[in-house]
Curated annotation (Swiss-Prot):
Record family assignment: Belongs to the glyceraldehyde-3-phosphate dehydrogenase family.
Protein known as: Glyceraldehyde-3-phosphate dehydrogenase
Example GO BP: lysine biosynthetic process via diaminopimelate
Organism ancestry: Archaea, Methanobacteriati, Thermoplasmatota, Thermoplasmata, Thermoplasmatales
Metabolic or biological pathway, per its Swiss-Prot or TrEMBL entry: Carbohydrate degradation; glycolysis; pyruvate from D-glyceraldehyde 3-phosphate: step 1/5
Gene this chain is encoded by: gap
E.C. numbers: 1.2.1.59
Length: 341
């Protein structure tokens, strides 16, 4: 049994904690919360609560939340820490983990040089195999790697152009925006290009990113110059080999991200999450050697299977065994939405 502690219980941390808790080979030692808020209270129903340091214990107990110990205590009872703290804190936290000689997994908001490797389950699982520290790439990069890996494997990629329409913030965040604007990234390519190269062997990658006033999902418009010829049916066949890709169609009333997330809620998974990357089949076109498609990304959850697989990769568990266990436990099945042509 792999003992795992979760440092940070926000959008990603709480989902990793749940996903880890339903694995038959992972035990959640506890979670670290910094503030004794409603989320800490709810978490205490399912997990041992730890705090960053001794100074926080009384604050939590004054709010009626029992504290098991501090981060130091959690590290002593864990084989691996999943660091889901706010962006940028990982560089400080890794010093603590190294001092305690505990393995750690970081999130995509950290710089790529924070660990021994960056991680995507499909494309480079073994680069983190039995390592000490790895970083699960961001929600956008995870989505791109997941749908491009089959294409790269089967047909090769000469050139890649991606326009990323990013959600402004997550549904529970009242601090960020924009609210009534579209905000373009002024860097070209956006940081997603270099991030993608940390998990896929690609050279010519060009990305443009824009923030839109929505909280539901990201949307990517993708153009791939293939090395080898392929037909649309060939591309579909490649994607259908991978459970974490879901093929949907506009004619089934998937007109927008609103309907996709409505479908996800109806699946009755934890928190109404959609772990798979949804590709509109209607959008897939091949002209000469250029492949075009549009995909939607549930930014709150697509990296969760990756975090579970990263735990097993650091622990020396086989790639295919891990992916199969993760998919089965989270009810990830992918394929064509209605299960037939």
């Amino acid at each position: 049994m792999i003992k795992v502690g979760i440092n940070g219980y926000g959008t990603i941390g709480k989902r990793v904690a749940y996903a880890a808790s339903i694995q038959d080979d992972i035990h959640v030692s506890g979670i670290v919360k910094n503030t004794p808020d409603y989320m800490a209270y709810l978490a205490s129903r399912s997990f041992n609560i730890y705090v960053p340091d001794d100074d926080k214990i009384k604050e939590f107990e004054d709010h009626g939340i029992k504290v098991k110990g501090t981060l130091n205590d959690l590290m002593e009872s864990s084989d691996i820490i999943v660091d889901a703290t706010p962006e940028g804190m990982g560089m400080e936290n890794i010093k603590i983990y190294k001092k305690k000689r505990v393995k750690a997994i970081f999130q995509g908001g950290e710089k790529s040089n924070i660990g021994d490797a960056s991680f995507n389950a499909y494309s480079n699982y073994n680069e983190s195999f039995k390592r000490e520290y790895t970083r699960v790439v961001s929600c956008n990069t995870t989505a791109l790697a997941r749908t491009l890996y089959p294409i790269l494997n089967d047909y090769g990629i000469e050139n890649l152009n991606v326009t990323l329409i990013r959600r402004a913030t997550d549904p529970n965040d009242n601090r960020k925006g924009p609210i009534n604007a579209i905000e373009p990234s002024m860097s070209f390519p956006s940081h997603h290009a270099d991030d993608l190269k940390t998990v896929l062997n690609l050279n010519n990658v060009y990305t443009v990113a824009l923030k839109a006033p929505t909280t539901l999902m990201h949307v990517h418009s993708i153009e791939v110059l293939l090395k080898d010829d392929a037909k649309i049916d060939d591309i579909m066949e490649s994607w259908l080999k991978y459970n974490r890709i879901l093929l949907i169609e506009g004619k089934d009333n998937f007109k927008s991200t609103a309907q996709i997330m409505d479908m996800a809620r109806e699946l009755r998974r934890d928190r109404g999450d959609l772990y798979e990357i949804a590709i509109w089949r209607d959008s897939v076109k091949v002209i000469d050697k250029r492949l075009y498609y549009v995909q939607a990304v549930h930014q709150e959850s697509d990296v969760i299977p990756e975090n579970i697989d990263a735990i097993r990769s650091l622990s020396g568990i086989d790639k295919n065994e891990s992916i199969e266990k993760t998919d089965k436990s989270l009810r990830i099945s992918g394929g064509i939405f209605y299960g037939k042509e």
